[in-house]
């Protein structure tokens, strides 16, 4: 015997369903009875997307990607302003991007990183974190650039591969940044490695203290992706189980309204058999993945455990491949997780790999908060 009350409880539907349909929730439902289930209210959420221009000009492809995404973004995150040991900044080429974001109602997040020659440098970070004089110069330069751009609302720190002995110094650095930038009208945020416990070992994790960072910044972006990565064995890039495990640990240390879930906008094509240290997997967009499946008449399957699509094919040279990527189903599963955990929103790495379904799903699920 099925009661309307059972449906309400099972699907977390609003109790007004009873009034709308004029039914006693404690009475059995008749076979064939039609129920009107109103759409759930959209959740307010923030969305950030990194964009990484390289070379001497922003490519037409990246300009198009920014135009496509910005109507559904809170922040277009310019990746990245690389810190130098004297406190100066190596700025990316950004011409046209602030205007595209501003015209669509999005603002700019300046991403400040410890990248050096395309690698995160722990020693570069140490030089910055150990000198308040250099930090003062750095903060002055960040402020000057933010004012020049004119549409910046957030200063976003992406310091990775930090030496373990710099954990406290990094917290103090972020605290000082907040003291400098908040009076000027900016928020500060930080990208954090995906941890599942406070004492998680490893050079990417040890200096990222969730609790302490969460206390001194306005929000964090958890990099919940790259379980499947170019140099590793084939698997989903962001399987929902490990992603949720990271988020649930984070919620024990950081308020939900300060947490952005990280989400990849790409997949990988692995040549089989996988050999550790051998050929790297090819990164490709969800759109390219579906085109490739069509090209090779491959059947796209869906892994319910990982909540991710994949397919296998044999190329023209007889080599076997497996492709893991994202689609509307996998993104909807992540959006459901964001809503269930009441998180601040989602941060994407990175624009430039077409995935139009993602932006449509944002519109269906959320009200994008603007800053």
Report each predicted region and the residues it spans.
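Primarily a LysM-type cell-wall glycan-binding module
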Residues: 1-12
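Loop/turn positions that initiate beta-strands
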Residues: 29-35
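Glycan-recognition patch characteristic of GH18 chitinases/ENGases
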Residues: 40-141
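Short, acidic/polar
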Residues: 54-70, 132-148, 202-211, 326-339
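Conserved, mostly hydrophobic/aromatic
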Residues: 76, 157, 220, 261, ...
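Active-site groove signature of glycoside hydrolases
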Residues: 77-80, 137-169, 219-233
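Substrate-binding surface in catalytic domains of secreted glycosidases
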Residues: 85-92, 166-295
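Glycan-binding loop/region signatures in secreted carbohydrate-active enzymes
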Residues: 118, 265-334, 358, 366-371
């Amino acid at each position: 015997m099925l009661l309307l009350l059972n449906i309400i409880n099972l699907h977390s539907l609003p109790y007004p369903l009873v009034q709308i349909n004029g039914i006693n929730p404690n009475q059995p439902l008749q076979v064939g009875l039609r129920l009107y289930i109103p759409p759930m209210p959209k959740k307010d959420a923030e969305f950030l997307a990194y964009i990484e221009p390289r070379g001497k000009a922003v490519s037409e492809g990246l300009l198009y990607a920014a135009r496509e995404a910005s109507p559904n973004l809170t922040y277009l995150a310019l990746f990245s302003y690389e810190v130098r040991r004297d406190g100066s900044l190596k700025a990316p080429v950004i011409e046209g991007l602030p205007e595209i974001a501003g015209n669509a109602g999005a603002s700019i997040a300046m991403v400040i990183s410890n990248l050096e020659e395309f690698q995160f440098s722990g020693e570069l970070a140490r030089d910055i974190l150990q000198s308040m004089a250099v930090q003062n110069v750095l903060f002055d330069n960040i402020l000057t650039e933010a004012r020049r751009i004119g549409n910046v609302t957030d200063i976003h720190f992406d310091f990775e591969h930090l030496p373990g002995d710099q954990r406290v110094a990094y917290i103090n650095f972020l605290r000082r940044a907040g003291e400098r930038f908040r009076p000027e009208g900016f928020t500060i945020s930080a990208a954090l490695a995906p941890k599942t416990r406070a004492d998680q070992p490893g050079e990417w994790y040890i200096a990222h203290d969730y609790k302490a960072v969460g206390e001194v910044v306005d929000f964090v972006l958890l990099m919940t992706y790259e379980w499947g990565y170019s140099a590793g064995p084939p698997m989903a890039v962001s399987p929902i189980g490990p992603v949720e495990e990271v988020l649930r640990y984070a919620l024990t240390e950081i308020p939900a309204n300060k947490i952005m879930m990280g989400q990849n906008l790409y997949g990988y094509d692995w040549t089989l058999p996988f050999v550790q240290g051998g050929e790297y997997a090819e990164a490709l967009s969800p759109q390219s993945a579906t085109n490739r499946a069509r090209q090779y008449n491959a059947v796209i399957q869906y892994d319910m455990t990982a909540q991710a699509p994949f397919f296998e094919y044999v190329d023209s040279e007889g080599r076997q491949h497996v492709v893991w990527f994202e689609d509307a189903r996998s993104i909807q599963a992540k959006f459901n997780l964001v809503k269930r955990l009441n998180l601040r929103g989602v941060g994407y790495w990175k624009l430039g790999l077409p995935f139009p379904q993602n932006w449509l799903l944002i519109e269906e699920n959320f009200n994008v908060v603007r800053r």
